[in-house]
């Protein structure tokens, strides 16, 4: 079962920040500078957390992963000023 996650991070080093930014594109949709919306099952969240752990400096950096619950039941109530907020919808993936 997929859950909807919001991932936010504060990375002190520009090189690590760029690396994490590129990595996160493989797991979700970019919302703002250091914020991603991700729709992940159990295996993908474990893979994402492992990838994050390899990049961050645990003494300097901070990553928050907010689990909003089962993706099919979550209807985020988001106020957006400026660019429209578009939640991730369930889509078929062709491999």
UniProtKB/Swiss-Prot annotation:
<dbReference type="GO" id="GO:0043571">
    <property type="term" value="P:maintenance of CRISPR repeat elements"/>
</dbReference>
<keyword id="KW-0378">Hydrolase</keyword>
<protein>
    <recommendedName>
        <fullName>CRISPR-associated endoribonuclease Cas2</fullName>
        <ecNumber>3.1.-.-</ecNumber>
    </recommendedName>
</protein>
<keyword id="KW-0255">Endonuclease</keyword>
<dbReference type="GO" id="GO:0046872">
    <property type="term" value="F:metal ion binding"/>
</dbReference>
<dbReference type="InterPro" id="IPR019199">
    <property type="entry name" value="Virulence_VapD/CRISPR_Cas2"/>
</dbReference>
<dbReference type="GO" id="GO:0004521">
    <property type="term" value="F:RNA endonuclease activity"/>
</dbReference>
<comment type="function">
    <text>CRISPR (clustered regularly interspaced short palindromic repeat), is an adaptive immune system that provides protection against mobile genetic elements (viruses, transposable elements and conjugative plasmids). CRISPR clusters contain sequences complementary to antecedent mobile elements and target invading nucleic acids. CRISPR clusters are transcribed and processed into CRISPR RNA (crRNA). Functions as a ssRNA-specific endoribonuclease. Involved in the integration of spacer DNA into the CRISPR cassette.</text>
</comment>
<comment type="similarity">
    <text>Belongs to the CRISPR-associated endoribonuclease Cas2 protein family.</text>
</comment>
<comment type="subunit">
    <text>Homodimer, forms a heterotetramer with a Cas1 homodimer.</text>
</comment>
<keyword id="KW-0051">Antiviral defense</keyword>
<keyword id="KW-0460">Magnesium</keyword>
<keyword id="KW-0479">Metal-binding</keyword>
<dbReference type="GO" id="GO:0051607">
    <property type="term" value="P:defense response to virus"/>
</dbReference>
<dbReference type="InterPro" id="IPR021127">
    <property type="entry name" value="CRISPR_associated_Cas2"/>
</dbReference>
<keyword id="KW-0540">Nuclease</keyword>
<dbReference type="Pfam" id="PF09827">
    <property type="entry name" value="CRISPR_Cas2"/>
</dbReference>
<feature type="binding site">
    <location>
        <position position="10"/>
    </location>
    <ligand>
        <name>Mg(2+)</name>
    </ligand>
</feature>
């Amino acid at each position: 079962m997929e859950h909807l996650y919001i991932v936010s991070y504060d990375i002190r080093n520009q090189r690590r920040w760029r690396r994490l930014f590129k990595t996160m594109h493989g797991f979700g949709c970019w919302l703002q500078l250091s914020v991603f919306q991700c729709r992940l099952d159990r295996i993908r969240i474990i893979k994402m957390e492992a990838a994050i752990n390899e990049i961050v400096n645990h003494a300097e950096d901070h990553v928050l992963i907010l689990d909003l619950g089962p993706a099919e039941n979550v209807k985020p109530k988001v106020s957006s000023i400026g660019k429209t907020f578009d939640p991730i919808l369930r889509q078929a993936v062709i491999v």
